[in-house]
Swiss-Prot record:
InterPro entries: Chromosome_initiator_DnaA-like, DnaA_dom, Hda, Hda_Enterobact, Hda_lid, P-loop_NTPase. GO terms for biological process: DNA replication initiation; negative regulation of DNA-templated DNA replication initiation. Keywords: DNA replication, DNA replication inhibitor. The gene is hda. This is DnaA regulatory inactivator Hda. Belongs to the DnaA family. HdA subfamily.
Amino acid sequence: MNTPAQLSLPLYLPDDETFASFWPGDNSSLLAALQNVLRQEHSGYIYLWAREGAGRSHLLHAACAELSQRGDAVGYVPLDKRTWFVPEVLDGMEQLSLVCIDNIECIAGDELWEMAIFDLYNRILESGKTRLLITGDRPPRQLNLGLPDLASRLDWGQIYKLQPLSDEDKLQALQLRARLRGFELPEDVGRFLLKRLDREMRTLFMTLDQLDRASITAQRKLTIPFVKEILKL
């Protein structure tokens, strides 16, 4: 996605991680709140937390995509990759329409980054126009941050836990991803994947992509025997 989402960092966000490709499961209220913040013209803040692989980054990528398509300037900061850049990359981000900070747990104990996030948060409050979305692997008060004022700020907004998908929802999510890629995932094949593979969604989606490519190359439909052959199960 070569859009204003790369205004601040040389990152390319995945084109297929949009709201249309996100299966909500038990997260409908969270999704509605997130989209409401994106629709409003003034600032808003949401903190999402969940274990890794639950879809936190997907939702931030989707938010960036939605506002970028409207022509708004957005910034995405993946703190799990903070060694690629310096805290000063946050300078001026309060001028953007949307700032997404992913994996904030990664800076716990890093004084420079904690202060940079704290200062950005305050500038965004003063601007009154920038939407702020932050994700972590636990609630703000449990982040073990060295800066108490930052933990307090993070606790101010709307806080949502991203609920994990049930197996039925995972099947629906896989079938949705397949349809968006232009092919069908038979129910029996989907259930076979859930039974035999790691059920973490990122792994399942990567496997689905692998099977899609193999199916195209072999010009064969997805069946359980074909899946066993490709995945060596």
